[in-house]
Structures are given as C-alpha cells and as structure tokens.
Amino acid sequence: MVGVGTDVHPFQTGRPLFLAGLEWPDEVGLSGHSDGDVAAHAACDALFSACALGDLGSQFGTSDPRWRGASGVALLTEAAQRVRAAGYEIGNIAIQIIGNRPKFAPRRHEAEKVLSAAVGAPVSCAATTTDGLGFTGRGEGIAAVATALCVRVR
C-alpha cells in the first residue's frame, strides 16, 4: 500500500524551528499545535494514508491535549506503532521538504538517521525551493510532501 501525506506551516517568530526531527538553532520556528515539524507530520500522514487509518488530525487532533507541543519525532514514533498494531509493516518513507530555509543539505543525513530510528524503517529526505513562487518562495513558511510504502502482514 502506498500513501501520500502533506503538511504546511507558516513561520512564527518566537518559536524554535523543528524540521525533519532536528532543531535548527538561529532559525524562526513554525506555528502549530505541536512543534510544527512539517516533514515529520507529512510522514505521519503518509503512513496513515497507506494503511487507511485516517490522517494526522484524526489520529493526533488539536482537541487532544496530549499532543500539544509534541515533537514530530514523538508523533512519528507513535504513528509507526499504530500502523504496526493495525497489521502493517513499513517499507520506507520518502520526504520532500519545500522552502527557502533552512539550508537542508548539510544536515540531511542527520535528519534521515533520526527519522529512520523513529519509524524503524528507512526514511529518505530531500529539499527543494519553488524559485520564488508561492508562500514558500516568499519565505512565509515551509511545506513537505511524503510517500510511504506499507505492506499488510496480518
């Protein structure tokens, strides 16, 4: 089963930036009920989509205070556990981050290691810009798209 997930958050001054499981010092953070980690959130959505388990909002809704301020890594770890509990194994997740900053390439391998450990399966990350187009191009926020491959095992 293949699932696709997306997430988008605007920048919010006064918050730390968490992206792809990493904290990015000296960067403006993203708004959100949790830590705003668009890469981790898109990966969660992709997992839930692949296994027909709803989406990030239905699994970790803003009405549930347990998830307020939660890290994207914690959400992704929990998402992977729920997918396995539903009878699926995770093959891999691929994440594409869309935004002008931070410069992702220098920390890509570090992010992949953290996210792979959270999922218990390979996670690859890439980043791109929109060449000045749209809200990410204007530097107003960051978006991410993820694809997950899951296999029913029971």
Curated annotation (Swiss-Prot):
Subunit structure: Homotrimer.
Pathway(s) where this gene product acts: Isoprenoid biosynthesis; isopentenyl diphosphate biosynthesis via DXP pathway; isopentenyl diphosphate from 1-deoxy-D-xylulose 5-phosphate: step 4/6
GO molecular function: 2-C-methyl-D-erythritol 2,4-cyclodiphosphate synthase activity; metal ion binding
Site keyed Transition state stabilizer: positions: 33, 129
Binding site for 4-CDP-2-C-methyl-D-erythritol 2-phosphate: 7-9, 33-34, 55-57, 128-131, 135, 138
Alphabetical list of Pfam families matching this protein: YgbB (PF02542)
Keywords: Isoprene biosynthesis, Lyase, Metal-binding
Protein family: Belongs to the IspF family.
GO biological process, one term: isopentenyl diphosphate biosynthetic process, methylerythritol 4-phosphate pathway
Job description of the protein: Involved in the biosynthesis of isopentenyl diphosphate (IPP) and dimethylallyl diphosphate (DMAPP), two major building blocks of isoprenoid compounds. Catalyzes the conversion of 4-diphosphocytidyl-2-C-methyl-D-erythritol 2-phosphate (CDP-ME2P) to 2-C-methyl-D-erythritol 2,4-cyclodiphosphate (ME-CPP) with a corresponding release of cytidine 5-monophosphate (CMP).
Keyword match Lyase: yes
InterPro entries attached to this UniProt entry: MECDP_synthase (IPR003526), MECDP_synthase_CS (IPR020555), MECDP_synthase_sf (IPR036571)
Cofactor: a divalent metal cation
Broadest EC class assigned to this enzyme: lyase
EC numbers, comma separated: 4.6.1.12
Binding site for a divalent metal cation: 7, 9, 41
Protein name: 2-C-methyl-D-erythritol 2,4-cyclodiphosphate synthase
Record's cofactor remark: Binds 1 divalent metal cation per subunit.
Reactions listed under catalytic activity: 4-CDP-2-C-methyl-D-erythritol 2-phosphate = 2-C-methyl-D-erythritol 2,4-cyclic diphosphate + CMP
Gene expressing this chain: ispF
